[in-house]
Amino acid sequence: VTVEYRIDPARTAEFVAAMRHLRQIRRRDGAFMWELFHDVEAQGRMVESFMVESWIEHLRQHERVTVADRAVSEMIRAFHIGGEPPKVTHLVAAER
């Protein structure tokens, strides 16, 4: 799963600090890989990437969201600028 955020570059350090909370949530809920990337060619473009065991497991993650988790997500979304929400992409392995 990738989530693309557009943020004010002046708030990058603050955004990265907030994303540490989301990393803990993703890991707790089964992500075995989590990274946050910045685009060196597009200032303010940040991409969260995480992997879970399966599509079903990812769907289950949505069912396990707590009130506290939702508050963290909303805090992070507040960094996102632009008219559209953060772009979410779901990729599944072509072969297993």
Enumerate the predicted regions with their spans:
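Short coil/turn motifs at secondary-structure junctions
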Residues: 8-10, 41, 53-55, 95
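Short, conserved charged micro-motifs
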Residues: 10-15, 57-60
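Short, glycine- and small/hydrophobic-rich beta-strand elements in well-ordered beta-sheets
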Residues: 20-47
